Swiss-Prot record:
Gene: pgmC
Chief location of this protein within or outside the cell: membrane
Residues annotated as binding heme: C438
Species annotation: Aspergillus terreus (strain NIH 2624 / FGSC A1156)
Localization (cell): Membrane
Phenotype reported upon loss of the gene: Abolished completely the production of the naphthoquinones derived pigments and leads to the accumulation of fusarubinaldehyde, the methylated product of pmgB.
GO terms under cellular component: membrane
Cited PROSITE patterns: CYTOCHROME_P450
Induction field: Expression is significantly up-regulated at the end of late growth phase, in the presence of Butyrolactone I. Expression is positively regulated by the pgm cluster-specific transcription factor pgmR.
UniProt name for this protein: Cytochrome P450 monooxygenase pgmC
Length: 532
């Protein structure tokens, strides 16, 4: 059967041997020609030629924490083709990634993960330059503070369904995991494409999951040998395995599509074309809004459930705050969150403990960079080591403990602290830094805070039961998927209503909302989505 479909002359064993040989020669050449200026930066002993190997080792966050404590502000490693400088202090972050951002805001070349899989159109993996800045401008226009505020009606509406789903569809103690994903996905789909997602088995949700899985695999360090050893990209095409293309295209026709972000981008496309953007890039911007806004928010919400189930005292403190600010007779609203500093602190604390990118945030030096007495050469991968930055005992007392109170003196949004010149004022680095700071950070914090306030108002979150006995909550690294994204593995948890009255309020509020709908930037939205 293989002989019938293989191309003429196709000899996989010879091509594999050729790939290995070219890879070895390329590594040896790179090793002999390596820039020795990095020798002034300390680092762990690793293997010749490949350093740690062609990809990061398992449980890299724990390893990177250990090395940061041993080597200080910066240390160096090698992963495949690239030298890495790992950055471990806010001061070093400010000096390297912010003050010298024009040199350090790029991404390492990714011949397969970026160029092939995304056609070179995906912003998170796009090199810094004119194309990236053009697309960043598109995103900036739809993530301004006023535009972010316009999301609130959809966030409150979806939160009501979330509470209803948690109350009525978690008998197996595991469905909540997908309800969090539906909540986050429906918010961003309604605003971007005008379509609501009523349940997690919605076709759009399943398509997004498949696309996200491809993008996670292809953007992870070491996902493809060709990305860590770029000379392999020069092999004959027959040597490259077929990659699944992941693209989210905005199929919008003027006058027919709902008045959503994808339509706005489509209708203003000529002005973006004039600046150099392409049709494919604008489609990826629309799809990228969904990519950035759904799995990260859902994963953080599920991490919150994990930590809250293990910390009943935190729930007690939050419940007391909710009763003072809201009372037991109505659901909390977004306006109430201004009077819920402890709830907002819970959100900051989970973002500190579980930054969505693991073990940190990667940049790439387009030019030589000077840090103290060190020269970091052009072509070096730069990693903001959140695995250590967020667990530095000098900055955080008992960093392994979930202690929201540590953030009660940080009442502002993360983006506000990121804009400050004093790096020590940063609450955390989860939303990146420098010119690649996440433009949707404020939107994400609102989605998290609205959902959390509602959940803690309505329910006590308890660990799952096995044979009638509560299970111990696993909060170790083993509780998380080893994907380069900090997403908890599915786990068991129960949502117990605080009272029959609150349970009825949850049910009544969703019944009313599902019949009445709401308005989003002046456009009616019903149970299916935007109606015009």
């Amino acid at each position: 059967m293989t002989d019938d479909i293989a191309p003429s002359g196709y000899q996989p064993h010879r091509i594999s041997t050729l790939a290995v040989l070219i890879g070895f020669i390329a590594l040896l050449t790179a090793w002999l020609r390596r820039d020795r200026r990095l020798a002034s930066i300390p680092g762990p002993r690793t293997y010749p030629l490949v350093g740690l190997g062609y990809k990061l080792p398992p449980k890299a966050p724990a390893l990177f924490r250990k090395w940061a404590m041993e080597y200080g502000d910066v240390f160096r490693i090698r992963v495949g083709w690239y030298d890495w400088v790992v950055i471990n202090s806010p001061e070093a972050i400010a000096e390297i990634l912010e003050k010298q951002a024009v040199k350090t805001s790029s991404k390492a070349p990714s011949p397969l993960g970026h160029d092939v899989v995304t056609g070179g159109n995906r912003m998170p993996t796009m090199p810094y330059g004119k194309e990236w800045r053009n697309l960043r401008s598109v995103v900036r226009q739809i993530t301004t503070v006023p535009m972010t505020a316009s999301f609130v009606p959809s966030q409150e509406f979806e939160a009501k369904q979330l509470l209803f789903d948690l109350a009525t569809d978690n008998e197996n103690q595991r469905n909540f995991y997908q309800h969090m994903r539906r909540y986050a996905f429906s918010i961003i789909m309604t605003n971007t494409f005008g379509t609501r997602v009523k349940s997690w088995d919605h076709p759009d949700a399943q398509n997004a999951v498949r696309s996200q899985a491809v993008l996670r695999r292809t953007s992870r360090p070491g996902a493809f040998l060709v990305d860590e050893l770029p000379p392999l990209a020069r092999l004959p095409k027959x040597x490259x395995x077929x990659x699944x293309x992941x693209x989210x295209a905005a199929k919008v026709e003027t006058g027919k599509a709902p008045h959503c972000y994808a339509r706005e981008i489509y209708e203003s496309r000529e002005s973006w074309y004039a600046k150099g953007a392409t049709e494919e890039q604008l489609a990826w911007v629309s799809g990228g809004l969904v990519e950035a806004g759904f799995e990260t928010t859902a994963g953080t919400l599920n991490s919150l459930v994990l930590y809250l189930a293990a910390n009943p005292q935190v729930q007690k403190t939050a419940q007391e705050e909710l009763m003072r600010a809201v009372g037991p007779h109505r659901l909390p609203t977004f306006e109430d969150t201004r009077r819920l500093p402890y709830i907002r602190a819970c959100v900051k604390e989970v973002l500190r403990m579980n930054p969505i990118l693991s073990p940190g945030i990667r940049h790439y030096a387009d030019e030589d960079v000077v840090y103290k007495e060190h020269v970091i050469p052009k072509g070096t991968v730069l990693l903001a080591n959140t695995a250590y930055l967020h667990y530095d005992p000098r900055r955080y007392k008992d960093p392994q403990k979930f202690m929201p109170e540590r953030y009660l003196d940080h009442p502002l949004y993360s983006s506000d602290y990121a804009a400050m010149t004093d790096p020590s004022r940063r609450d955390h680095f989860t939303f990146s830094t420098g010119r690649r700071t996440c433009p949707g950070a404020r939107l994400a914090e609102n989605s998290l805070t609205i959902a959390l306030a509602g959940m803690l108002w309505a329910f006590e979150i308890r660990p799952g039961l096995v044979d009638g006995v509560e299970t111990e909550v696993d909060m170790s690294d083993d509780a998380y998927l080893d994907t380069g994204f900090t997403l908890p593995k599915p786990f068991a948890a129960r949502f117990l209503p605080w009272s029959e009255e609150r349970l009825q309020i949850v049910k009544e509020q969703w019944e009313l909302a599902s019949k009445k709908g709401y308005e989003l930037r002046g456009v009616p939205v019903d149970i299916e989505g935007m109606t015009k």
